[in-house]
Amino acid sequence: MATLKPPESQLLKTLTSILTSEKTHFLETLNPYIPQITQPLLTSLLSSPSLAKKPETLVSFFQWAQTSIPEAFPSDSPLPLISVVRSLLSHHKFADAKSLLVSYIRTSDASLSLCNSLLHPNLHLSPPPSKALFDIALSAYLHEGKPHVALQIFQKMIRLKLKPNLLTCNTLLIGLVRYPSSFSISSAREVFDDMVKIGVSLNVQTFNVLVNGYCLEGKLEDALGMLERMVSEFKVNPDNVTYNTILKAMSKKGRLSDLKELLLDMKKNGLVPNRVTYNNLVYGYCKLGSLKEAFQIVELMKQTNVLPDLCTYNILINGLCNAGSMREGLELMDAMKSLKLQPDVVTYNTLIDGCFELGLSLEARKLMEQMENDGVKANQVTHNISLKWLCKEEKREAVTRKVKELVDMHGFSPDIVTYHTLIKAYLKVGDLSGALEMMREMGQKGIKMNTITLNTILDALCKERKLDEAHNLLNSAHKRGFIVDEVTYGTLIMGFFREEKVEKALEMWDEMKKVKITPTVSTFNSLIGGLCHHGKTELAMEKFDELAESGLLPDDSTFNSIILGYCKEGRVEKAFEFYNESIKHSFKPDNYTCNILLNGLCKEGMTEKALNFFNTLIEEREVDTVTYNTMISAFCKDKKLKEAYDLLSEMEEKGLEPDRFTYNSFISLLMEDGKLSETDELLKKFSGKFGSMKRDLQVETEKNPATSESKEELNTEAIAYSDVIDELCSRGRLKEHSRSYTS
């Protein structure tokens, strides 16, 4: 406390006497003394033990002084405030103390002077801050949405070995999890670890906050790990909130088998599923398109006296709309009304969007009118739906007019969804610069880009081969606190593979794991497929093993990528080993898989083995044109024309239509052997099919592993025709044949 001069000491006694008197209008008595009240005198008054015994008087005097003698309050010093707060805390006036701190933080703490005074107390702040002062300041910063500042105070308490109370800790965890930063969850985890070290007794809310944080970031494995720890290590029983949080995250990811297992675990722990639990199940089934099962869950709800609510019906209607069942969706809305459940804006938005999705613009407009008639006010989502469908109809000028109309007439403020819609519209017409301009405009307006928009821009940059820009955008996303996910990294991994930058793709994979983003099967498939395509199948197998160890189940794409990788490397025996082993683990190969293997055998000149495998296939399954084409091509390369013709007849008997690849195999062989008359006949037969085949070129190319490996192979038909034309020209018969090709 500052030392006062003798006159000031006497004045201090006088003012203290006035303030501690029983007079009701004591503040008016102070007015004549205003010119004499200096900053040191004010600090001494606020710290007076006599005045501290009267907290209400102290607060009244403090507020009077702030208005009457503002010059006595230094802008960079919260010491007068701290003096008042100490007094309030000593009398357990916690709400009043917090209110004063919140007001100060809101209006006078731009430079974080309060926080700095607590973190670095000097001689003027005596005694040092107490645990109660730290607690209440931490709580005030959280109230004002500044968990990063509150975290510094918490860390100071830990260094001083002051144990924060549980409520303070849980409030800090909630603030961090809600704060939009890429470091929020890791910071929350550090707070949790400090709570454990310092001996704070944890409760179920502590764990629920962390579980929610992990789920928000898509880190389901970490959430499940926390669930296991709370029971086994900390002996804290999870509640419905714990389970429902994880169930919701699982349902969003479509992990229905895991969801069922967790539901069983929930019941084992004596918890009864509530409406939120059932709604998560309904959502999970709808997400997978299993509408029958979703409706069965609703029936189960009714049987267990848990009535479906508006949320339940909205989930079902959304599921029906996603399945294109608009009539059933509209009927379900009518059923809601009969149950006295009034459709809300979510119900209408879902149905309106569903109608637009199916091209039912008129019905969508009618629903908008019905919505207005029912007194349901259109919201931001409704407007964004309208804009989205204008964009899909490629009416960008109409979109611009619509946005202006909504802003002028309805107070509409473009949000992240609006900008995402506009960005997609620009990208749809190939205007990447326009999309990037929209992204910059978002930043200028302080609208934070969400993960979906970020991924959309990254995908466009990768497709435009602007990988450096894409990588820079990812790095800036981390720095600016954007949430990235496995799709973000998967997009860049695919982009680098497309540009033959295998090492960069692997770096992205390692970085994804470093920031603790859990890859999905799709992400693994991107990596495995890319490695196999670039001749690194053994490394792909390591990633395949990693996938299995992570608890994920490989899908058909995973197995086919490995098989194709081995075949491309000429290691057909290894491909068959993997194929046979995969079948033991529930892999069900389709025609695509079998065609890869058959083509692998043929490419390596193993025609006899290929024929044996082919015969096995036609006995066990309905093969397709590609299967026959592969075998016909092998026979033609071996100059076994009769066997090739036999297969051609066989496939036609089975109703399989020969295509350009079928005939190309024959033409190549016939031309090589100089059999022009047979070539003539085949070309005439082929010319009638040429028109339809031309339209199917892209589809056939994508389907046929035997002919889709390089640009050179894609041009085999053109080469064959060129050879035919050269030969005909040399014999003077081009005019005659050109008539047959164009007739």
Swiss-Prot record:
<feature type="repeat" description="PPR 11">
    <location>
        <begin position="485"/>
        <end position="519"/>
    </location>
</feature>
<feature type="repeat" description="PPR 15">
    <location>
        <begin position="624"/>
        <end position="658"/>
    </location>
</feature>
<feature type="repeat" description="PPR 14">
    <location>
        <begin position="590"/>
        <end position="620"/>
    </location>
</feature>
<feature type="repeat" description="PPR 2">
    <location>
        <begin position="165"/>
        <end position="202"/>
    </location>
</feature>
<feature type="repeat" description="PPR 10">
    <location>
        <begin position="450"/>
        <end position="484"/>
    </location>
</feature>
<dbReference type="Pfam" id="PF12854">
    <property type="entry name" value="PPR_1"/>
</dbReference>
<keyword id="KW-0677">Repeat</keyword>
<protein>
    <recommendedName>
        <fullName>Pentatricopeptide repeat-containing protein At2g16880</fullName>
    </recommendedName>
</protein>
<feature type="repeat" description="PPR 3">
    <location>
        <begin position="203"/>
        <end position="233"/>
    </location>
</feature>
<feature type="repeat" description="PPR 16">
    <location>
        <begin position="659"/>
        <end position="689"/>
    </location>
</feature>
<comment type="similarity">
    <text>Belongs to the PPR family. P subfamily.</text>
</comment>
<feature type="repeat" description="PPR 5">
    <location>
        <begin position="274"/>
        <end position="308"/>
    </location>
</feature>
<feature type="repeat" description="PPR 8">
    <location>
        <begin position="379"/>
        <end position="414"/>
    </location>
</feature>
<feature type="repeat" description="PPR 1">
    <location>
        <begin position="130"/>
        <end position="164"/>
    </location>
</feature>
<feature type="repeat" description="PPR 12">
    <location>
        <begin position="520"/>
        <end position="554"/>
    </location>
</feature>
<dbReference type="InterPro" id="IPR011990">
    <property type="entry name" value="TPR-like_helical_dom_sf"/>
</dbReference>
<dbReference type="GO" id="GO:0003729">
    <property type="term" value="F:mRNA binding"/>
</dbReference>
<dbReference type="Pfam" id="PF13812">
    <property type="entry name" value="PPR_3"/>
</dbReference>
<feature type="repeat" description="PPR 6">
    <location>
        <begin position="309"/>
        <end position="343"/>
    </location>
</feature>
<feature type="repeat" description="PPR 13">
    <location>
        <begin position="555"/>
        <end position="589"/>
    </location>
</feature>
<feature type="repeat" description="PPR 9">
    <location>
        <begin position="415"/>
        <end position="449"/>
    </location>
</feature>
<feature type="repeat" description="PPR 4">
    <location>
        <begin position="239"/>
        <end position="273"/>
    </location>
</feature>
<feature type="repeat" description="PPR 7">
    <location>
        <begin position="344"/>
        <end position="378"/>
    </location>
</feature>
<dbReference type="InterPro" id="IPR002885">
    <property type="entry name" value="Pentatricopeptide_rpt"/>
</dbReference>
<dbReference type="Pfam" id="PF13041">
    <property type="entry name" value="PPR_2"/>
</dbReference>
